[in-house]
């Protein structure tokens, strides 16, 4: 594939912050080589009018720290937004990015833009055992498909297919917009509550399995069981509800609910996370049934690493495995949680090396 120690520029671009990294990959290694970071820096995205001056500053800083300018073979940037024909207009930032324009202005032979969750798909390939927690151990087939889903602000899904000779291809998915399928009387009541709240005829799984989903589940439960709500959470909820349409917020209800469930200090929070984890696991199982990911199913996103003890308690894996006649099949699929918060940045580097 090329000489040893080829250098790439990788970036994880968000509306608030951008992480840039100069990485090297030994392309002569057999199989997929993991990227090694030479220099990394985090910037405030709104502080720059465009990505170009940010990258120029980054390269100057890298040259100063490393002692000399480093040539870059290719670049790949993971972006929180839709990427069409290697272009993207960021939702929360007045940037319109084009891979061709960036390549020309930065004097880099090739610049690829990819969606941030597609970057997570590539990033899985660059992780080590220290970056993962096992929820279900099973033999991994190196030639098998890999499935990834991750709840955070929304619910991302994608899958990875090996192409042979240490190369992989990531495919995006909009599976999170599939229907939420209730499995219990309480989940049916949750569905009807959300349909009425949003004036919709259907509810997507993302409205339940996401950070906002946790908040909505708690809101539903306090509506169903007002006598179970503690005075502390009643006050938190009222503040959150008052501020939710404001730019400045002082309460993150989803974080408060999950933390209380971790500490076992609130009955309604415990129940909310049980509902959330059951639905999360069920959707992970649905994805696994569709893809049969013998290469593993990975739970990514911002929520999972923060609630490992809850994931290990059983509701998630019970929802995953409870597939009727297919239950024994579900036990053959490796399931792991991604702990490394920089998986998207790693993925951008892996993508650059493969493109």
UniProtKB/Swiss-Prot annotation:
Q: Does the keyword Kinase apply?
A: yes
A GO CC annotation given for this chain: cytoplasm
Q: Which UniProt keywords apply?
A: ATP-binding, Cytoplasm, Glycolysis, Kinase, Nucleotide-binding, Transferase
| EC number in record | 2.7.1.2
Q: Name one GO molecular function term.
A: ATP binding
**Which GO terms are recorded in the biological process aspect for this UniProt protein?**
glycolytic process
Q: Does the keyword Transferase apply?
A: yes
Its annotated compartments are:
Cytoplasm
Q: Which reaction does it catalyse?
A: D-glucose + ATP = D-glucose 6-phosphate + ADP + H(+)
Annotated CDD domains: ASKHA_NBD_GLK
Annotated family: Belongs to the bacterial glucokinase family.
Annotated protein name in UniProt: Glucokinase
What is the originating organism of this protein?
Synechocystis sp. (strain ATCC 27184 / PCC 6803 / Kazusa)
């Amino acid at each position: 594939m090329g000489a040893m120690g080829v250098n790439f520029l990788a970036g994880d671009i968000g509306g608030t912050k951008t992480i840039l990294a100069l990485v090297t990959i030994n392309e002569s290694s057999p199989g997929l080589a993991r990227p090694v970071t030479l220099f990394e820096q985090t910037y405030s995205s709104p502080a720059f009018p465009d990505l170009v001056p940010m990258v120029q500053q980054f390269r100057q800083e890298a040259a100063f720290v490393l002692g000399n300018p480093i040539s870059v073979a290719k670049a790949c940037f993971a972006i929180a937004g839709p990427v069409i024909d290697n272009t993207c207009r960021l939702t929360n930032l007045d940037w319109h990015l084009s891979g061709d324009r960036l390549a020309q202005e930065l004097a880099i032979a090739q610049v690829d833009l990819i969606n941030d969750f597609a970057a997570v798909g590539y990033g899985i390939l660059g992780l080590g055992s220290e970056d993962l927690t096992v929820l279900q151990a099973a033999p991994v087939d190196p030639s098998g498909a890999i499935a990834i889903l991750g709840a955070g602000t929304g619910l991302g899904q994608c899958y990875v297919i090996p192409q042979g000779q240490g190369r992989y291809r990531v495919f995006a998915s909009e599976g999170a917009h599939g229907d939420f399928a209730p499995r219990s009387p309480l989940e049916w009541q949750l569905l009807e509550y959300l349909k009425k709240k949003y004036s919709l005829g259907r509810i997507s799984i993302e409205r339940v399995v996401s950070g906002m989903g946790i908040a909505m589940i708690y809101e539903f439960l306090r509506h169903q069981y007002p006598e179970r709500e503690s005075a502390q959470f009643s006050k938190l909820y009222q503040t959150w509800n008052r501020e939710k349409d404001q730019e400045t917020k002082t309460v993150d209800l989803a974080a408060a609910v999950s933390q209380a469930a971790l500490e076992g200090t609130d009955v309604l929070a415990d129940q909310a996370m049980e509902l959330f984890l059951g639905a999360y696991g069920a959707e992970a199982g649905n994805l696994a049934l569709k893809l049969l990911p013998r290469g593993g199913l990975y739970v990514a996103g911002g929520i999972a690493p923060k609630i490992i003890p809850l994931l290990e308690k059983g509701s998630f894996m019970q929802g995953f495995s409870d597939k009727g006649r297919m239950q024994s099949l579900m036990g053959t699929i490796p399931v792991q949680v991604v702990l490394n918060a920089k998986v998207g940045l790693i993925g951008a580097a892996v993508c650059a090396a493969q493109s």
